[in-house]
Amino acid sequence: MENKLLSSQEIQELRKSLPTWEEAEGKLVKRFKFTNFIEAFGFMTKIAIISESLSHHPEWTNIYSEVIIRLSTHDMGGITMLDYKLAKAIDAIKYE
């Protein structure tokens, strides 16, 4: 079930396929570096489109060529399968 809060064990198991993401304060967190602001903003635009299709939106920060993304399901108070799905989709965008 996508909106079920994941246990610590489930999160650790799923993170095996997300080795570059960290778990911090009940969120999946990753920092992305780009060569310039336009690349960073283009990346965020692609994520926005996917986020809308999932009806699940990231918490993010953009400072020039850096984007920091934090994923959690606010209604559930932690990490769910929706966060995992969005993290996988974000990684696919970054490395396409």
Swiss-Prot record:
Catalysed reactions, semicolon-separated: (4aS,6R)-4a-hydroxy-L-erythro-5,6,7,8-tetrahydrobiopterin = (6R)-L-erythro-6,7-dihydrobiopterin + H2O
Keywords, ordered alphabetically: Lyase
Entry GO MF terms: 4-alpha-hydroxytetrahydrobiopterin dehydratase activity
EC number: 4.2.1.96
GO biological process: tetrahydrobiopterin biosynthetic process
Intrachain disulfide bonds: none
Pfam families xrefs: Pterin_4a (PF01329)
Family: Belongs to the pterin-4-alpha-carbinolamine dehydratase family.
NCBIfam families: PRK00823.1-2, PRK00823.1-3
Protein name: Putative pterin-4-alpha-carbinolamine dehydratase
